[in-house]
């Protein structure tokens, strides 16, 4: 965990990029299941 100045740790990038992706996938599948995502 040392020498992180000027360099973003990979796990932070994965977490920040993964949460919205998982959220969008969850909303998409929930919308498709409930019928609201039929227009997508």
UniProtKB/Swiss-Prot annotation:
Q: What is its main location?
A: plastid
**What UniProt keywords apply to this chain's record, in alphabetical order?**
Chloroplast, Membrane, Photosynthesis, Photosystem II, Plastid, Reaction center, Thylakoid, Transmembrane, Transmembrane helix
Q: Where in the cell is it found?
A: Plastid, Chloroplast thylakoid membrane
Does the record carry Plastid as a key word?
A: yes
| Family to which this protein belongs | Belongs to the PsbJ family.
The entry describes its oligomerization and partners as: PSII is composed of 1 copy each of membrane proteins PsbA, PsbB, PsbC, PsbD, PsbE, PsbF, PsbH, PsbI, PsbJ, PsbK, PsbL, PsbM, PsbT, PsbX, PsbY, PsbZ, Psb30/Ycf12, at least 3 peripheral proteins of the oxygen-evolving complex and a large number of cofactors. It forms dimeric complexes.
| Entries under InterPro entries matching the protein | PSII_PsbJ, PSII_PsbJ_sf
Q: Name one Pfam family in it.
A: PsbJ
Q: How does it sit in the membrane?
A: Single-pass membrane protein
Q: List the disulfide bonds.
A: none
Q: Which organism is it from?
A: Pelargonium hortorum
Instruction: Please indicate which superkingdom the organism of origin belongs to.
Output: Eukaryota
Which cellular component appears as one GO term in the record?
Answer: photosystem II reaction center
Transmembrane segment boundaries: 8-28
**Gene Ontology process terms (BP):** photosynthesis
Function according to Swiss-Prot or TrEMBL: One of the components of the core complex of photosystem II (PSII). PSII is a light-driven water:plastoquinone oxidoreductase that uses light energy to abstract electrons from H(2)O, generating O(2) and a proton gradient subsequently used for ATP formation. It consists of a core antenna complex that captures photons, and an electron transfer chain that converts photonic excitation into a charge separation.
Q: What is this protein called?
A: Photosystem II reaction center protein J
């Amino acid at each position: 965990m040392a020498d992180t100045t000027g360099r973003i740790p990979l796990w932070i990038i994965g977490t920040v990029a993964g949460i919205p992706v998982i959220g969008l996938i969850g909303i998409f599948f929930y919308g498709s299941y409930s019928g609201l995502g039929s227009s997508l």
